[in-house]
Amino acid sequence: MLAPDYPITTERLLLRPVHESDAAAMRAYKSRADVCRYLPHDVLSLEQVTERISTLYANTTLEDEGQSLTLAVIERASGVMVGDVILFWRNREHRAGEVGYVLDPAFHGRGYTVEATAALLALGFDGLGLHRIVGRLDARNTASARVLEKLGMRLEAHFVSNEYLKGEWTDELVYALLEGEWRMRT
């Protein structure tokens, strides 16, 4: 079980559960076609974001495999929500997890995605005792691949025409990091 003490603090960011009051800030980036291009959903309306906050993003703990924890990423200096990150608990027996992230393009290029995702990796390895964490992405999303590489994750798979996404077959990349590798980096 994982029950973090919130907020989770990094050098420049706070990570905390997503609140209903975050809906407008989240909609600002999740309603953009360029942001949603590589995501498994289309652009979201304010109503759809609000619904997700009360359902998909409602967990504040992870109690069993199959659950996910979505956290708001807040810039400490301004108090502004800059994105969200997610930790999936994929398999208890194999101690497997997955990370994901979405950042408002207004905050790209500052290293926030790497900083926030590093905090998620720490939660997964230190808090949940995971052995392996992966990141999966559309192969065309080179910016996302760079994030995972900066975190020390290695490319383990390139699946050709693996997913039918938004009317086209897309390639998928899978990056991974083992707990021991994480410990050597931190």
Per-region residue spans from a language model:
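Acyl-donor (CoA/ACP) binding surface of acyl/acetyltransferases
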Residues: 1-37, 54, 70-186
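Short, surface-exposed helix-loop/turn micro-motifs enriched in polar/charged residues
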Residues: 27, 41, 63-65
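A short gly/proline-enriched turn/hairpin at secondary-structure junctions
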Residues: 36-45
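Active-site rim helix/loop that mediates acceptor-substrate recognition in acyltransferases
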Residues: 45-66, 72
